[in-house]
């Protein structure tokens, strides 16, 4: 088998997940596969260690092609073998990459707990811890939007004192088990 080297000149060993050498490189249907654009048998040193994706946002990382080589080219063509990925941790099986990098990095808008929110200008801004706590315990309302809580009591009449709003720390302490704050005047 030819000596394979990465872009920094380090040897690349073609092995399976158990460390056994790969003799014949095939896809899931048994067809021989070859990988182009990622591995070469001669070391190529670049000025930059960044990938070509930054320079060409719509370029493909590597393309795989089913075998079209003559039958005796087994060991020689293993130098461009599938199973060696371009740093993504995945192997390809005859599919070409179509579309830009942004399409693959797009995320869904639904999230159960978000640490950022819309800034109103098409971007995102990071929530503060105070905002997260208010959202969790204070139902996420602003101070001017909160409705005062009314308590109905049955039993002996109490003195009519104006009800003070609980601070955020008191609300948190009330939610914690065993830390109920009963120091109300």
UniProtKB/Swiss-Prot annotation:
GN (gene name): LEA
Annotated spans, Disordered: 1-185
Sequence similarity: Belongs to the plant dehydrin family.
One GO MF term: metal ion binding
Composition bias, Basic and acidic residues: 1-10, 44-55, 130-146, 161-177
Gene Ontology cellular-component annotations: cytosol
Pfam families documented for this protein: Dehydrin
InterPro entries: Dehydrin (IPR000167), Dehydrin_CS (IPR030513)
UniProt protein name: Probable dehydrin LEA
């Amino acid at each position: 088998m030819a000596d394979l080297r990465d872009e920094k000149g380090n040897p690349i060993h073609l092995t399976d997940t158990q460390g056994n050498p790969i003799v014949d490189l095939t896809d899931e249907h048994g067809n021989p596969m070859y990988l182009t654009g990622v591995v070469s048998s001669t070391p190529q040193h670049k000025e930059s260690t960044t990938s070509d994706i930054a320079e060409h946002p719509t370029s493909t990382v590597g393309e795989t092609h089913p075998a079209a080589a003559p039958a005796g080219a087994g060991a020689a063509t293993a130098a461009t073998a599938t199973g060696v990925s371009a740093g993504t941790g995945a192997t390809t099986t005859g599919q070409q990459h179509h579309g830009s990098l942004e399409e693959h990095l797009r995320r869904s808008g639904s999230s159960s707990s978000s640490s950022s929110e819309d800034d109103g200008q098409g971007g995102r801004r990071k929530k503060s811890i105070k905002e997260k706590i208010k959202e969790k315990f204070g139902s996420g309302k602003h101070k001017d939007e909160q409705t005062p809580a009314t308590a109905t009591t049955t039993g002996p009449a109490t003195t009519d004192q104006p009800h003070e709003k609980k601070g955020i720390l008191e609300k948190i302490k009330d939610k914690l088990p065993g830390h109920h704050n009963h120091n109300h005047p």
